[in-house]
Amino acid sequence: MDWQNRFSVLNLSSHDPLPELMLTHLTGWGAITLVGADKKAYLQGQVTCNVVSLQEQQVTFGAHCDAKGKVWSVFRLFHHHDGYAMFQPQSAMEVELRELKKYAIFSKVTIAESSDIALGVMGSQADAWIDTVSETTGDVRRIAGGTAVRMSPQRWLLLVNAEQAEQYVNAWQGLHVEQSLWTRMDIEEAVPVVTQTAQNEHIPQALNVQAVDGISFTKGCYTGQETVARAKYRGINKRAMYIVKGNLSAPLSQDEPVVLERAVGENWRSAGALLTHYRFTDSIAIGLIVLPNDLEHDVKLRLAAQPDTRWHIQPLPYSLSDE
């Protein structure tokens, strides 16, 4: 069997525990790489995170904005091969590549979409498995064929060449699952995400990038910095990203925006579209959405296309209070 066809749907209800060890092929994600003598200085002037202080064993969130502070991409940045990799949703990468390259002609830097394969290791035994393929410690490790990166306590990214990816997949002793479980864990961890449909809509703080340490307020200038700084010091940001959960009366659309409405008195008003979503087998779904940050947490929500549903804001796994 072709290694790329070994991944199957794992049907889970909202009450089922996650298996201890899973591997997935992250075809919906990819990486942009930067190599060259000026890679560090160039990227430092483009993104919200501090590239200069990023150590070999560290990974950081970051955002890339336009001049008005609107986000093109939210990514995980780490050292990869002889440069940097920016891991992010595949659908955002075409526009992000174009914008990131805009001023690169003046620098000794090569910016490209990586041809490496992205695999995701998930479950309570993920750390133990990584230790079997790595001789080092830390959140970023050089492994055969590429790099292993800790995404969260029970998740690792493997960014490796195709030959090594095939070896890992064929030798895998856990479950081979399709990538929606990675999306589910992103949602439950409230990982900031920008896909193609949400590019250039929000400032970083509306996506909680500051809450996951993806913004340095002490580094030098970068594109969009003025807006990002005003949002922090003048309190101009009025939005935040939330986890929402609710019931379904029909499957969610994979092609059209999934819009929520919120109750305003006796009426309903559009609240915006989900950034991403995951459906359980028991007609329950979860998602991420940007909402006004002064909303009451018991506000009533519903799917615009399914008005008989009821959705609610869920607790975030981190604090927004230090914004």
Swiss-Prot record:
What Pfam families does UniProt report for this protein, alphabetically? YgfZ_barrel
Gene Ontology CC, one term? cytoplasm
Residues holding folate = W29, W182
Where does the UniProt entry say this protein principally localizes? cytoplasm
Under the GO molecular function aspect, what terms does this record hold? folic acid binding
Protein keywords = Cytoplasm, Folate-binding, tRNA processing
The GO annotation for biological process reads: iron-sulfur cluster assembly; RNA modification; tRNA processing
InterPro entries with a match to the protein in the record: GcvT/YgfZ_C (IPR029043), tRNA-modifying_YgfZ (IPR023758), YgfZ/GcvT (IPR045179), YgfZ/GcvT_CS (IPR017703), YgfZ_barrel (IPR048451)
Location in or out of the cell: Cytoplasm
Q: Does the keyword Nucleus apply?
A: no
The similarity comment for this entry is: Belongs to the tRNA-modifying YgfZ family.
Sorted alphabetically, which NCBIfam families does this protein's record hold?
Answer: PRK09559.1 (NF007110), ygfZ_signature (TIGR03317)
What the protein does comes down to:
Folate-binding protein involved in regulating the level of ATP-DnaA and in the modification of some tRNAs. It is probably a key factor in regulatory networks that act via tRNA modification, such as initiation of chromosomal replication.
Q: What is the name attached to this protein's record?
A: tRNA-modifying protein YgfZ
